[in-house]
Amino acid sequence: GLFFIDFNESLNISNTAFGFAIGVQMLMWGLTGPIFGAIADRYGGHIAIISAFIFYTVGIYFLYTGPNTGIFFQIHMGLLIGIGLGGTAISIPMSIVGKHFPLSTRTIAMSIVTAIGSFGYFLSPIFTNYSLKEYGWNYTLFIFLLFLITGLLAAYFVRSPSKSESVEKVSDQSFKEALTEAFKTKSYILL
């Protein structure tokens, strides 16, 4: 939402178009999260995160370079960035951390990742607001691109362990079977 005024003034993006793009972004984030989770389970967390970072980076890049009005704004801001969020938000990194640490230290490791992620969520709007005021929306998006490229490079070095630290028996359950089981569980539905 911090970009709205700049997008409205520079690109003539209406609040309806901006709101719709954010709605598409949130929808794509929610829809692709389980898909990236399945990719992480099957091929490794690094593949899921790298794939998501590519979508996120391409979305920001095209938003930065244009064309970024009309349907292009919806594709870049809504679709691509939303898909990227599905695999780069906290859920996939948490699953990777969970697989890397034994039960005895898993809780502290996951707590550290959560704390760092939360601190990032705290700092991000402060930094974004400062950058927008000092440098404008275009340069702020360029800075975001640099952060994303750094994350993409770092994700390349993330490797899933060959064997999870806590899993003794690996389930042969398919993605469809897992979804069916989840939607039959009252706690999952309430969540």
Where would I find each of the regions flagged by the language model?
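Extracellular/periplasmic helix-loop-helix junction of adjacent transmembrane segments
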Residues: 2-30
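Intracellular juxtamembrane helix-capping segments at the cytosolic ends
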Residues: 7, 87-101
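Conserved MFS/SLC helix-loop-helix module at the cytosolic interface between two early adjacent transmembrane helices
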Residues: 31-71
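Hydrophobic core of transmembrane alpha-helices in multi-pass small-molecule transporters
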Residues: 70-88
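Helix-loop-helix hairpin linking two adjacent transmembrane segments in secondary transporters
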Residues: 112-163
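Flexible cytoplasmic inter-helical loops of multi-pass small-molecule transporters
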Residues: 159-177
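Juxtamembrane cytosolic amphipathic helices that cap and anchor the N-termini
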Residues: 180-191
